[in-house]
A protein has these predicted regions:
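Short cysteine-rich clusters marking metal-coordination/redox-active sites
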Residues: 163, 184-187
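Flexible, glycine/small-residue-enriched loop-and-beta-strand segment within the central core
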Residues: 2-7, 22-128
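Short linker/helix segments within small regulatory modules
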Residues: 173-180
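Short, non-ligating residues that shape and space the ligands of small metal-coordination modules
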Residues: 171-172, 190-194
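Internal alpha/beta core interface subdomains
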Residues: 131-134, 140
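Short Cys/His-rich Zn2+-coordinating modules
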Residues: 56, 60, 98, 113, ...
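Cys/His-enriched microdomains
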Residues: 158-161, 182
Length: 207
C-alpha cells in the first residue's frame, strides 16, 4: 500500500515514510525523520527532525513529538500529547543572547513497544516509557515508567498495571513465593511482580 500525504501536510523530502503510512492535514514531518510501515500521523501533529518511529504507530491530532524521540512498534500518542526535548529550557543564554541550535543539546523521550500516551499528557525528556505501559490523559511524566505500568497524575505515579490489551490487570492468587500476581481480564495472561517496593516491575509467567 502506498503512503498517503494530505495536500496541506508539510513533509520534508529528507523524511522516510514506510509503506502504508498516512500523514493527515496540517501535520509536519521534519528532515531525516523515519517512520515505519502503516503509521498514522493525525491533523496538525508535529514529528521533529530525526525522530524515529517503528511500524503501526499512531500519533493523534496536534501531538508534538520533538527530536530526538524514539518510538518502537505499535506506540500510541494521544491528541495534544507533548514529548519534550529540553530538560532545562531557556530562550536566551546567560549573557542575554538568543539561544541557537549550537547552544544546547536536545534530549529525547524513548517509548517501547505497544505503550500508550493519553491525551494531553506531557513526557519530560529524557524519560523512558516501558513496553505496553499506559500514561493516563493529562499526566506529567518526569521519571521512567516500567513496562506494563499504568501511571497518572502530576507528577505521574504508578496506580496499577495493564496488559497488552490495554485494560487494567486484576488481582490473582499469589505465586508460590508469595509474590503478588495479576491477570489480564481480556487474555487471561498471568503476571507476577518483582523487585523492591520503590522499584517494582512485572513480568509474564506461565503458571
Amino acid at each position: 500500500m502506498a503512503t498517503r500525504i494530505a495536500p496541506s501536510a508539510d513533509v520534508s523530502q529528507d523524511a522516510a515514510l514506510g509503506e502504508g503510512t498516512s500523514i493527515w492535514h496540517l501535520a509536519q514531518v521534519r528532515e531525516r525523520a523515519v517512520l515505519g510501515r502503516d503509521c498514522i500521523v493525525g491533523r496538525g501533529a508535529y514529528i521533529g527532525e530525526g525522530v524515529v518511529m517503528g511500524d503501526n504507530c499512531k500519533v493523534q491530532n496536534y501531538a508534538l513529538v520533538y527530536e530526538p524521540a524514539r518510538l518502537a512498534d505499535g506506540v500510541f500518542i494521544g491528541p495534544a500529547v507533548t514529548l519534550t526535548n529540553d530538560h532545562f529550557p531557556r530562550a536566551v543564554n546567560p549573557d542575554g543572547t538568543l539561544k541557537s541550535a549550537s547552544d544546547w543539546e536536545p534530549v529525547g523521550v524513548t517509548i517501547d513497544e505497544g505503550a500508550s500516551i493519553g491525551a494531553r499528557a506531557v513526557c519530560v525528556a529524557p524519560v523512558h516509557v516501558g513496553a505496553w505501559a499506559t500514561v493516563a490523559a493529562g499526566a506529567v511524566v518526569t521519571k521512567d515508567v516500567p513496562a506494563h505500568a499504568l501511571v497518572a497524575g502530576v507528577p505521574a505515579r504508578r496506580i496499577g498495571w495493564v496488559g497488552r490489551a490495554g485494560e487494567p490487570l486484576v488481582p490473582a492468587e499469589a505465586g508460590p513465593d508469595g509474590a503478588p500476581r495479576w491477570r489480564c481480564p481480556v487474555s487471561g495472561t498471568l503476571y507476577q511482580e518483582a523487585g523492591s517496593e520503590s522499584d517494582t516491575t512485572i513480568r509474564e509467567v506461565t503458571h
